[in-house]
A protein has these predicted regions:
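Flexible loop residues that form catalytic
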Residues: 27, 76, 122
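Alpha-to-beta junction loops
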Residues: 14-24, 45, 94, 110-118
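Secondary-structure junction motif
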Residues: 31, 69-92, 155
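Flexible hinge/capping segments at coil-to-helix
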Residues: 34-45, 49-71, 156
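Short beta-strand-to-loop elements that line the ligand-binding cleft
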Residues: 1-6, 73-74, 92-104
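Beta-alpha-beta core module
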Residues: 32-38, 42-43, 105-154
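Extended ligand-binding regions for polar small-molecule ligands
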Residues: 64-67, 142-167
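Central regulatory/effector-binding core of bacterial HTH transcription factors
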Residues: 1-29
Length: 167
């Protein structure tokens, strides 16, 4: 399966060929109408901070807590993240640093510079030098089950069963 952040051939464009379904948030600029989607859950944003940061001891982080800090944000990570990124840039109190993907190199560099990273919680606890703290920003990230535009009968039955469970 292709790298999720490879613009030439994304996982979403591999649906129906290499994979049947994918659980993920959604990025309109990256995936457009490449697949169908079924909303399964909403998850909160997290701010991943170095364990040595004073913010690491907080139970929640607000925009005010981030004033004057550098915050790494995945560009086109998902539509909700893009919207939050625009608001943070407009506010001007947080130095937003665009990144292209999440990997250990990103977190290593962020730790060296004392930067925070905006995530949906999936990276929380993955890098040993970081802790994820819920971000009170008034929005959540919808997570979807993505499936092909023309699913096989088995995939459509699975999607229908998921939809029934979610209702």
């Amino acid at each position: 399966v292709s790298d999720l952040y490879d613009e030439r051939e994304t996982v979403m464009r591999s649906l129906g060929r290499e994979v049947d379904v994918v659980q993920s948030s959604f990025s309109t600029p990256r995936w457009g109408d490449a697949c169908q989607k079924l909303r399964i859950v909403n998850v909160p944003f997290y701010i991943d901070v170095p364990r040595t940061s004073p913010l690491a001891r907080k139970s929640r982080i607000t925009v005010a807590d981030l004033e004057g800090m550098r915050l790494r944000v995945l560009r086109h990570g998902n539509d909700a993240m893009d919207s939050l990124r625009i608001d943070l840039l407009a506010d001007g109190g947080v130095d937003v640093i665009d990144v292209d993907s999440f990997d250990f190199a990103l977190f290593n560099e962020a730790e060296e510079k004392g930067d925070a990273v905006l995530t949906c919680g999936a990276w929380s606890g993955v890098h040993p030098a970081f802790v994820g703290v819920p971000f009170l920003c008034g929005r959540e990230v919808p997570v979807y089950l993505h499936y092909p535009l023309e699913p096989t009968l088995q995939v459509q039955k699975f999607v229908n069963a998921m939809a029934q469970l979610l209702n």
